[in-house]
UniProtKB/Swiss-Prot annotation:
Protein name (record): Glycerol-3-phosphate dehydrogenase [NAD(P)+]
Enzyme class label: oxidoreductase
Catalytic activity: sn-glycerol 3-phosphate + NAD(+) = dihydroxyacetone phosphate + NADH + H(+); sn-glycerol 3-phosphate + NADP(+) = dihydroxyacetone phosphate + NADPH + H(+)
E.C. number: 1.1.1.94
GO biological process: carbohydrate metabolic process; glycerol-3-phosphate biosynthetic process; glycerol-3-phosphate catabolic process; glycerophospholipid metabolic process; phospholipid biosynthetic process
UniProt: NADPH binding residues: S31, W32, R52, K122, A156, R271, E293
Length: 339
């Protein structure tokens, strides 16, 4: 589909002046990792995608698709199961792994001393509440100028299908954010550099809870009025958590905060939204956990809230629903008692 004002991207890696701009590695061959790797390739970077599943990697290399995680999308990149090969000489390394996989993969990364590492992970570390950039920084011994995160309304299938999208690239060093944004420069994909890495990461994790609540309301066949009220109440807790931890209102009410909440709560592509529907319908917890990482990562949000003295009764009640200690109906009662 051709959108007026948004030219479709080239069906191959664009050659810029002086050749390909950067050697880029993406670690993680799930839907978002594959989508961002394909985008980076289209933006003119020499891109290689790493994954553990040999069947997925072989399919990407031979059939140019990832039918398991991103069906129906033609891919223009190379993929490998060799981690050392993937990151060799890479100037930028994107991390698109589930949070539970970091402890297994990060120690194996052998990076160039000037490599910039970019987190695509939208959660906080379970039980500790540490931001993913903090976890990565400690594991790889990286300074702030070599760390960045990307967040926003980033539904992988829409990005992969060239739907116009806006994301925030955040780093404590704004120069780093600008450098990373440059590697992603591509028609239809727009990046806003930011130095509010704390706010962006906390928004990314907390919005999962809002989406779960929205999904629960949807799964209970409640109307849009109810769902809108629940989203607003959940968003209010997100706002308090971000501001108390040094984030800014500009981030919360921008695409990394409000924008991500709108997309995640309203799209049928949102896994956290789907997980909320499953919770409302009484699906087994294992099935819900497999649907979205946000279900597991709620403990990280609550840990950060406790550490920073932020009262989040809706998040606490949601955690009890997930653990089976509370019904979805009682969650609604708590939400509306706070209105």
């Amino acid at each position: 589909m051709q959108l007026s004002g948004y030219p479709m991207r080239q069906a191959s890696c664009d050659m810029k002046e002086g050749g390909l701009r950067n050697k880029v590695a993406v670690i993680g061959s799930g839907s978002w990792g594959t989508a961002i790797a394909n985008l980076l390739c289209k933006a003119g970077n020499e891109t290689i995608l790493w994954g553990r599943d040999e069947n997925v990697i072989d399919e990407i290399n031979n059939a140019r698709v990832n039918s398991k995680y991103l069906p129906g999308v033609e891919l223009f990149l190379r993929a490998t199961c060799d981690l050392d090969y993937a990151v060799a000489d890479a100037s930028h390394v994107y991390i698109a792994l589930p949070s539970f996989a970091l402890s297994k993969v990060l120690p194996k990364l052998s990076l160039d001393k000037f490599s910039i590492v970019i987190s695509l992970i939208k959660c906080l570390e379970p039980d500790t509440g540490r931001r993913m950039s903090e976890v990565i920084s400690e594991a790889l011994d990286l300074g702030h100028n070599r760390l960045a995160v990307i967040s926003g309304p980033n539904l992988a299938l829409e990005v992969a299908n060239d739907e116009p999208s806006v994301s925030v690239v955040a780093s404590a060093n704004i120069a780093t954010a600008n450098i990373v944004a440059g590697t992603l420069k591509c028609p239809g994909f727009y990046c806003i550099p930011s130095s509010d890495i704390k706010g962006v990461e906390i928004c990314a994790a907390s919005k999962n809870l809002v989406a779960l609540i929205s999904g629960i309301a949807r799964g209970m066949d409640l109307g849009d009025n109810t769902r809108a009220a629940l989203i607003t109440l959940g968003f209010r807790e997100l706002l308090r958590l971000v501001l108390e931890n040094g984030g800014t209102e500009e981030t919360v009410f921008g695409v990394a905060g409000l924008g991500d909440v709108v997309a995640t709560c309203n799209s049928h592509l949102s896994r956290n939204n789907k997980a909320g529907v499953l919770l409302a319908k009484g699906a087994p917890l294992d099935e819900v956990k497999q649907t979205a990482e946000g279900v597991v990562a709620i403990s990280g949000v609550l840990a950060l809230a406790e550490r920073s003295g932020v009262y989040m009764p809706i998040a606490q009640a949601l955690s009890q629903v997930i653990s089976g200690k509370r019904t979805a109906h009682s969650l609604l009662d708590i939400c509306f008692s706070l209105a």
